[in-house]
């Protein structure tokens, strides 16, 4: 079964950059591009969309809370109606730059705190899906399988793709272990092994030991981790060696 490889990109701001987006775009098949709320700005959005379009990489809107200082990782209480508008705003803005580059936004992936809160709360998940269908009912949602995001997508008639993480350990319940927890962020060797395990066995490492089932049609390699590009290159090589075809899900 083919597997998509994605990364969070375009997460700089002004003269400040994070990661080597150009090099990462040579390796991934889908790019989750920041839309200016948790990171990114109009110039970075334009540039990253152009780089992705040149390489035939699918463009996804990486939507988050309006929280540049906290990089979108702080929990923010928000009315679902306001969240719907903020998500629609972000998707629409990125789609403008994607179309200017000859491409389009084909999927949406929530970022950071929104990723986790919308996975747990149906009202927030419904707001994300409402924003997506407001713009284009054919948009695909990328997120954690078996959560309120998947349930909301099913109810809205939106295609859902489960996501696994190569460089993160999980809880026994199949959720990402908090970043601050010992062993939650995997080194390169462990990340390579986990990507192959997700692709071939549908399982990922549990932070306390053992493994847990992870339903994923796409695997994320974070672009802000040390040596992220080399890790992504090793993951692609390992997947190929395991007979896994890497291709975009849209």
Curated annotation (Swiss-Prot):
Assembly mode: Forms a complex composed of PxpA, PxpB and PxpC.
Role according to the record: Catalyzes the cleavage of 5-oxoproline to form L-glutamate coupled to the hydrolysis of ATP to ADP and inorganic phosphate.
Family: Belongs to the LamB/PxpA family.
One protein family per Pfam: LamB_YcsF
CDD domains: LamB_YcsF_like
Superkingdom of origin: Bacteria
Family matches, as SUPFAM superfamilies: Glycoside hydrolase/deacetylase
UniProt EC number: 3.5.2.9
Reaction catalysed by this enzyme: 5-oxo-L-proline + ATP + 2 H2O = L-glutamate + ADP + phosphate + H(+)
Species this chain originates from: Nocardia farcinica (strain IFM 10152)
A GO biological process held by the record: carbohydrate metabolic process
UniProt keyword annotations, A-Z: ATP-binding, Hydrolase, Nucleotide-binding
Gene Ontology molecular function: 5-oxoprolinase (ATP-hydrolyzing) activity; ATP binding
HAMAP family attached to this UniProt entry: PxpA
Full protein name: 5-oxoprolinase subunit A
Keyword Protein transport: no
């Amino acid at each position: 079964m083919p597997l998509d490889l994605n990364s969070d990109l375009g997460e700089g701001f002004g003269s400040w950059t994070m990661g080597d987006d150009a090099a990462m775009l040579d390796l991934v098949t889908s790019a989750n591009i920041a839309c200016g709320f948790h990171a990114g700005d109009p110039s970075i959005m334009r540039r990253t969309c152009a780089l992705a379009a040149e390489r035939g990489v699918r463009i996804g809107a990486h939507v988050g809370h309006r929280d540049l200082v906290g990089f979108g990782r702080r929990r923010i209480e928000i009315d679902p109606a306001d969240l719907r508008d903020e998500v629609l705003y972000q998707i629409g803005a990125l789609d403008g730059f994607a179309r200017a580059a000859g491409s389009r936004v084909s999927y949406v992936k929530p970022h950071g705190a929104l990723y986790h809160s919308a996975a747990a709360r149906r009202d927030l998940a419904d707001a994300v899906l409402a924003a997506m269908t407001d713009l284009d009912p054919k948009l695909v949602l990328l997120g954690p399988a078996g959560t309120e995001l998947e349930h909301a997508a099913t109810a809205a008639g939106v295609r859902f793709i489960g996501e696994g993480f190569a460089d993160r350990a999980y809880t026994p319940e199949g959720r990402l272990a908090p970043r601050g927890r010992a062993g939650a962020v995997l080194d390169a060797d462990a990340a390579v092994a986990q990507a192959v395990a997700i692709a071939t066995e549908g399982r990922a490492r549990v932070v306390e030991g053992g493994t847990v089932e992870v339903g994923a049609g796409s695997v994320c390699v974070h672009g802000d981790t040390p040596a992220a590009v080399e890790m992504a290159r090793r993951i692609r090589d390992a997947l190929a060696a395991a007979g896994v075809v890497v291709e975009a899900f849209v």
